[in-house]
From Swiss-Prot:
A single MF term (Gene Ontology): glycerol-3-phosphate dehydrogenase [NAD(P)+] activity
Binding annotation for sn-glycerol 3-phosphate: 108, 139, 141, 194, 247, 257-259
Species this protein is from: Listeria innocua serovar 6a (strain ATCC BAA-680 / CLIP 11262)
Family in the record: Belongs to the NAD-dependent glycerol-3-phosphate dehydrogenase family.
Protein location: Cytoplasm
N-terminal signal peptide: none
Protein name: Glycerol-3-phosphate dehydrogenase [NAD(P)+]
Catalytic activity of the protein: sn-glycerol 3-phosphate + NAD(+) = dihydroxyacetone phosphate + NADH + H(+); sn-glycerol 3-phosphate + NADP(+) = dihydroxyacetone phosphate + NADPH + H(+)
Function (record text): Catalyzes the reduction of the glycolytic intermediate dihydroxyacetone phosphate (DHAP) to sn-glycerol 3-phosphate (G3P), the key precursor for phospholipid synthesis.
Listed InterPro entries: 6-PGluconate_DH-like_C_sf, 6PGD_dom2, G3P_DH_NAD-dep, G3P_DH_NAD-dep_C, G3P_DH_NAD-dep_N, NAD(P)-bd_dom_sf
Catalytic center residues: 194 (proton acceptor)
EC code(s) of this entry: 1.1.1.94
Gene name linked to the record: gpsA
GO cellular component, one term: cytosol
Length: 338
């Protein structure tokens, strides 16, 4: 395979993990970061100890503080940043791009102010003439396990399946299997909304409830995700795949999951401000819960679990009381509530 340069915007755990994969595949990953300390550590020590402790990076992984340097000559630009920074970074990217480039994003969330998915935010901020294609790379994955080269599967979703296949070819190897899909909306809805349900799974575990409760929460949570997804144009089958149920399972059941850990602390009685301070990293489900709360009402979509989690986060609702209210809802036929 011909060696290709790939720029990665974001020096966090996911951006760094993907850079490791690209280096393993004999490509030239260049990470753009905004902190001297992290950029220097990647270049000099070949580690990123804050985000991926104990991982030694291939020497081919490089980092820079210069966006122009990172994207110069890159076949693909991967955007691996928190959703709250997406607009700002994409404005910078739009100014810096000199020719049409394949853009890939791995950020999972909804913009609260607009209810826009991340690909829609990118499309607003990066001129169409500078976007050769826009691909969503998503699925059941923790950066820590990708960096350890544990078996992982993802899905590259794009309306242009040829572009999705290019991304597939750059990242696929014996440790990371990539599928392709043309349902961008479904991939983004599944990836974003599962973070809300993962908060709920953590809350359930923090309250001391068992596997029964979490299994029910995940299953009924997926019903809510599917209802909203179909309402905005997703293929319902997408939610049975990697970017749907796959991503939900890994995020609701793993100690690597920031959303599960945050929910677990909430379930044990800590308030949201305390939890976010202790986490020290972005918890996307909190921001997404705020967005989906208003979005579901606007679309008249029934999402009782999501609404309960919103109430716990932002209205100081007692978690046990929220569970009691969910369990006491009007009886239904299961098939009618999907």
């Amino acid at each position: 395979m011909t060696q290709k340069k790939v720029a990665i915007l974001g020096a966090g755990s996911w951006g760094t993990g993907l850079a490791l994969v690209l280096a393993d595949n004999n490509h030239k990953p260049v990470i753009w970061g905004n902190l001297d300390k992290i950029v220097n550590e990647i270049n000099e020590s070949h580690t990123n100890s804050h985000y991926l402790p104990d991982i030694i990076l291939p020497t081919e992984v490089k980092a820079t503080l210069s966006l122009d340097e990172a994207i110069d000559g890159a076949e693909i630009v991967v955007i691996a940043i928190p959703t709250n920074a997406m607009r700002v970074v994409c404005k910078q990217l739009n100014e810096a791009l000199k020719e049409p480039t394949i853009l890939v994003h791995v950020s999972k969330g909804i913009e609260p102010e607009t209810n826009l998915r991340m690909s829609e935010v990118i499309e607003e901020e990066v001129d169409a003439t500078k976007r050769k294609a826009l691909v969503v790379l998503s699925g059941p994955s923790h950066a820590e396990e990708v960096a350890l080269r544990h078996p992982t599967t993802l899905c590259a979703s794009c309306k242009d399946l040829k572009a999705a296949e290019i991304v597939q070819d750059r990242f696929i190897n014996n440790n990371l299997r990539i599928y392709t899909n043309d349902d961008v909306i479904g991939a983004e809805i599944g990836g974003a909304l599962k973070n809300i349900i993962a908060l709920g799974a953590g809350i359930s575990d923090g309250l001391g409830y068992g596997d029964n409760a979490k299994a029910a929460l995940m299953t009924r949570g997926m019903a809510e995700i599917t209802r909203l997804g179909v309402a905005v144009g997703s293929n319902p089958q997408t939610f049975y795949g990697l970017t749907g149920i796959g991503d939900l399972i890994v995020t609701c059941t793993s100690v690597h999951s920031r959303n599960w850990r945050a929910g677990n602390m909430l379930g044990k009685g800590e308030n949201l401000d305390e939890v976010l301070e202790k986490m020290g990293m972005v918890v996307e489900g909190v921001r997404t819960a705020k967005a989906v709360h208003g979005w579901a009402k606007k679309l008249d979509i029934d999402m009782p679990i999501t609404e309960s989690i919103y109430a716990i986060l932002f209205e100081n609702k007692d978690a046990r009381e929220a569970v009691d209210l969910l369990m006491g809802r009007k009886k239904k036929i299961e098939k009618e509530s999907f």
